[in-house]
């Protein structure tokens, strides 16, 4: 399926149409949601976190060891699998680095206004939280990345309520060109049997979510999808997870920033945030009864350089 086939939800540029497609079909690939200049500016710092593809594919064992050692790897929960066929393999989940990053530019990209605006538009609500924030890097040859079709039911402790006001939006922002031979996510099209939602993917066309850097793949947890293998020699693929839920939806979650908010990467990030950006992580907005003059003073001490004017003005 071509990335230009907008009738399938791949490569849409009109945000209203893209939001409607997500609401009706559960997924959409928004082409160029973030300008490539913004992506490229941030990706200059990506190689402080990951080996450059040229370096990685030079077959230096020390470089591969660095990649493995710096990854937040969830693959331990999956059993070993045979080399052939679609399966969840431990090494598929190498390459995760959790937010906040040591890169200020990538941290700012995590809350890019175009992404948060689209999430609000698609979800149909303004008060949202970012609950999954990480980068995922893959390189050809690390493992067989071919997965079976699956749904992401591990974002919720109760069954998903797939209705306006209740649904969450999962998303991948493309940091690199995600072409057909570097593992674009595959989506199972066709109407799902909502009476038996976990029985398997629907019969219908399969869509490859190939797209350019700056594109954003948004999907819901009921969508059947899978990872595919990287087949390009010397290939790589980098995505930024940016997933959102309604404020107050404590039953949904994935990544938690509170334990790292005393570290330098978060402090630097938070000091540059607007109230609305901090609210994506649960911080009370100006005017919330949580705030007192003393707490606003403490906010300035905790995040040197933050513009606390909105919080202070709201106390007046």
Where in this protein do the model-derived segments appear?
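Non-heme Fe(II)-dependent double-stranded beta-helix
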Residues: 2-24, 31-149, 155
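Catalytic core of non-heme Fe(II) oxygenases with the double-stranded beta-helix
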Residues: 117, 142-210, 251-257
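A structural signal for short, well-ordered beta-strand segments
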Residues: 132-135, 171-173, 240-244
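Active-site lining segments that contact anionic ligands and/or coordinate catalytic metals
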Residues: 206, 213-214, 235-239
């Amino acid at each position: 399926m071509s990335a230009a086939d907008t009738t399938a939800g791949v490569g849409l540029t009109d945000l209203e149409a893209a939001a409607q497609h997500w609401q009706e079909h559960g997924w959409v690939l928004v082409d160029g949601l973030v300008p490539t200049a913004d992506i490229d500016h941030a990706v200059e710092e990506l190689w402080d976190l990951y080996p450059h593809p040229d370096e990685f594919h030079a077959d230096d064992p020390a470089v591969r060891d660095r990649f493995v050692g710096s990854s937040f790897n969830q693959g331990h929960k999956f059993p070993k699998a045979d080399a052939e066929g679609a399966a969840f393999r431990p090494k598929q989940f190498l390459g995760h680095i959790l937010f906040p990053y040591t890169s200020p530019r990538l941290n700012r990209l995590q809350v890019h206004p175009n992404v948060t605006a689209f999430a609000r538009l698609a979800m149909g609500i303004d008060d949202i939280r970012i609950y999954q924030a990480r980068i995922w890097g893959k390189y050809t040859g690390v493992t067989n990345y071919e997965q079976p079709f699956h749904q992401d039911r591990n974002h919720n402790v109760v069954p998903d309520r797939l209705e306006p006001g209740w649904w969450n939006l999962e998303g991948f922002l493309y940091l690199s060109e995600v072409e057909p031979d570097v593992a674009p996510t595959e989506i199972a099209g066709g109407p799902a049997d909502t009476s038996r939602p976990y029985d398997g993917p629907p019969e219908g066309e399969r869509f490859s979510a190939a797209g350019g850097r700056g594109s954003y793949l948004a999907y819901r947890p009921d969508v059947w999808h899978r990872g595919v293998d990287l087949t390009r020699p010397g290939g790589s693929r980098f995505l930024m997870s940016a997933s959102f839920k309604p404020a107050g939806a404590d039953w949904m979650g994935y990544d938690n920033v509170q334990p790292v908010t005393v570290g330098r990467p978060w402090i630097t990030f938070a000091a540059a945030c607007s109230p609305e950006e901090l609210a994506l992580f649960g911080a009370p907005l100006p005017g919330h009864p949580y705030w007192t003059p003393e707490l606003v003073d403490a906010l300035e001490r905790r995040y040197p350089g933050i513009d606390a004017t909105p919080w202070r003005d709201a106390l007046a």
